[in-house]
Amino acid sequence: VVGALNKDLPYDEFLRRQIAADLMDLPVREQAALGFLTLGRRYLNKHDLIIADRIDVTFRSSMGLTMQCVRCHDHKSDPLTMKDYYGLYGVFDSTEEVPNGELPVIAPPEDSPGYREFRRELIKRANAAHEYAVARIKNYQRPADPLKFDRKAALSKLNQTERGKYRGLLAKIDELEGKSEFAPARAMAVRDRIKPREPVIFERGQQSSRGPKVPRAFPAFFREEPDRTFRQGSGRLELARELTRQDNPLTARVCANRVWMHVMGRPLVSTPG
């Protein structure tokens, strides 16, 4: 955010990156903007509640619209329906967080304070351990015809349980490396699922009460084309473009109202959120 302000990044471009930087033709470091989606509340990792929060935060922050009401029923005062809500639910349900071991590196590790000294010490200790092991081996008898192990062949002999333990250890190593204070900076990013999920309406907002299917789409009242739905992957990039298109003035007006509030002490419209 600070970098975007310092570069005077246009507000519409700033918003698009917050929602869909991974789907835009941008350097990988720009995926740091996706923290807007990933760093929200977790609700004990309840998937439907995390998605509900992302919908609410996205629309309150950009268009000043509260979307929580239409999760359970059509809005009584705004032109928003449950069909609109679950069309957006499908967008975020078709999006997944990138696992820790695969998070995109947004800055070379050399930029991390103390990284070079850390690497030197790591190499020094690894070499010392290797030299110690070699010296110890010399004290034991060696067969005339040593048996050579092929790593892949050895792994293929493991049963399913052992393979699971092995993968778990590798994942733990990745996790420790990722959490190291000397690890390279990584983006808390999201990505589209391989296969988008087709949303359905949850009757009364209950995930267990599945109603009719709906298309992934922008809320109908604000659409440029009434019948247009999202067809590119999850639909996040299309959503970002709909939020920031020039003939959707609500996004710009909400931003102007908030800027006015911070500069002048009170907003032009009394409900900036």
What are these regions (language model features)?
Residues 11, 68, 165:
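Short phosphate-engaging motifs
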Residues 7, 28, 46, 50-53, ...:
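Extracytoplasmic/periplasmic, Sec-exported soluble proteins
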Residues 22, 99-267:
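Short, functional "switch" segments adjacent to catalytic/cofactor/reactive centers
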Residues 53-55, 223-226, 272-273:
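Active-site-adjacent structural elements in folded domains
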Residues 1-37, 43-44, 171-174, 178-181, ...:
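Extracytoplasmic c-type cytochrome modules immediately beyond a signal peptide or single-pass transmembrane anchor
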Residues 56-60, 67, 74-89, 239-273:
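Structured DNA-binding interfaces in DNA transaction proteins
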Residues 2, 23-120, 124:
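Sequence context surrounding c-type heme c attachment/ligation sites in exported
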